[in-house]
Amino acid sequence: MKKVLVKAVHGYQRWISPALPPACRYYPTCSNYMVQAIEKHGPAKGLAMGTARILRCHPFCQPGYDLVPDHFSLRRNWAEPEKEEDSN
């Protein structure tokens, strides 16, 4: 089931998404988030997390990073990604 869902998202990314204007306000994009959530949390929880992410991606949301959390949650992950230290 996991592979079927991931293939469906990849099909969307390859065939449908290029025909639409870019609209995702988050990083990673909603479709990439869906794939990562499915791979990390399994098909049922990953699909629920991806759907929740799509529903909160709208013009009135605050854009930014929203990485897939380590623990199942339908809420936004407000944690900023770790920044690499500059060696200079």
UniProtKB/Swiss-Prot annotation:
A Pfam family it matches: YidD
InterPro entries, per the entry: Membr_insert_effic_factor_YidD
Role according to the record: Could be involved in insertion of integral membrane proteins into the membrane.
Membrane topology according to the record: Peripheral membrane protein
Family: Belongs to the UPF0161 family.
Organism: Lactococcus lactis subsp. lactis (strain IL1403)
Gene Ontology cellular component list: plasma membrane
Subcellular location: Cell membrane
Principal location listed in the UniProt entry: membrane
Claim: Ion transport is one of the keywords in the record: no
The name this protein goes by in its record: Putative membrane protein insertion efficiency factor
UniProtKB keywords: Cell membrane, Membrane
